[in-house]
């Protein structure tokens, strides 16, 4: 079975190789196809170049506008009053944390005072 597969593969390879080596017999037909192909590609090439340059310009301009919008947004953030709100919130959080710490410390001091026996009335 393996030899049959090998023989079939070898025959297929020979057929493909012979078709690559056999040139077209009609030289007039080849020159006519060449002329038609060259006529088709000549006008398309400048159009492709024009489209490429327009695409490049559009891409660069889009990147510029995107950068400009980002800069304007950052400037707006700097000038807005939202920074003050965040600062006040942060100050309030700090004050609240300090108050909680002081209350915990006062509770610990009170418990240690009670343990020492100073809180008893005799």
From Swiss-Prot:
Tell what triggers its expression: Produced in the A cells of the islets of Langerhans in response to a drop in blood sugar concentration.
> Keyword Signal, does the record have it?
yes
Q: Which Pfam families match?
A: Hormone_2
The record places propeptide residues at 83-86, 122
The UniProt keyword set, sorted, is: Cleavage on pair of basic residues, Hormone, Secreted, Signal
Q: Where is the signal peptide?
A: 1-21
| Recorded GO MF terms | glucagon receptor binding; hormone activity
Q: Which GO terms describe its biological process?
A: response to starvation
The entry's cellular-component GO terms read: extracellular region
Location within or outside the cell: Secreted
The principal localisation class reads secreted
Family annotation (InterPro entries):
Glucagon (IPR015550), Glucagon_GIP_secretin_VIP (IPR000532)
As for what it does, the entry says: Promotes hydrolysis of glycogen and lipids, and raises the blood sugar level.
Its family remark reads: Belongs to the glucagon family.
Q: What is this protein called?
A: Glucagon-2
Origin species, per record, is: Lophius americanus (American angler)
Question: Encoded by which gene?
Answer: gcg2
